[in-house]
Design a protein with these regions (language model features):
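Fe(II)/2-oxoglutarate oxygenase catalytic core
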Residues: 1-165, 173-194
Length: 194
């Protein structure tokens, strides 16, 4: 077994969603049905139990109410490829995952961003589900915007195209953020395994 010492080796991108499929999701989540369900993204502060934005009014909006069996299956298949194929040689000491969260939709309008953070997600665990986030799964639904670059490790711009799903460990060693959108609207989703 060969260990991978460059953290970038743990970041994998898969082109798994067709442009038409991505467009169909954007059409659904942009419909009047979901308009009231979008809310400002916040970060949980474990020290005092509060939720707050780190970018003030420039924080993105999120939609948790969207559910799609087809998208769940795409996410599941991509996690499987990452964990059981691309990192199959780690199976002897890494037991994979116990489940994954339903994808949460992200919408970045002009000027909106996501502050630098790592994915220590506390809200996933309500007493029934137990564990820690192990993998972060990001999907990009469009690319007809400017700005909105996905950055890892403080300053590394990750190539990310419409229809791509990117997976990386949900660890403090993988800080990431999205730069402010300059034109258009950026649509993506995120899920986590535990």
């Amino acid at each position: 077994m060969a260990f991978r010492y460059d953290l970038r080796d743990y970041v994998k991108t898969y082109s798994v969603m067709s442009p038409e499929y991505c467009d169909s999701i954007i059409k659904i989540i942009g419909s009047e049905q979901f308009a009231p369900s979008w809310e400002k993204h916040t970060f949980y502060d474990v020290r005092d139990g509060s939720n707050h934005t780190r970018s003030g009014n420039d924080e993105l909006e999120v939609l948790s109410a969207f559910g799609s069996q087809e998208l769940n299956q795409i996410v599941w298949n991509t996690i499987h490829k990452y964990a059981l194929e691309d990192f199959a040689d780690y199976k002897q000491w890494w037991d994979g995952w116990n489940g994954f969260s339903a994808p949460r939709m992200n919408r970045y309008s002009v000027g909106q961003t996501m502050a630098i953070h790592c994915d220590h997600i506390h809200s996933m665990f309500d007493g029934t589900r137990k564990g820690i986030p192990v993998l972060t799964i990001l999907g990009l639904l469009n690319d007809d915007f400017t700005g909105g670059e996905f950055k890892l490790f403080d300053d590394v711009t990750m190539e990310f195209k419409k229809g791509d799903i990117m997976i990386f460990p949900s660890s403090f060693m993988f800080p990431h953020y999205v730069t402010p959108v300059k034109t258009g609207t950026r649509y993506s989703f995120v899920s986590w395994t535990w």
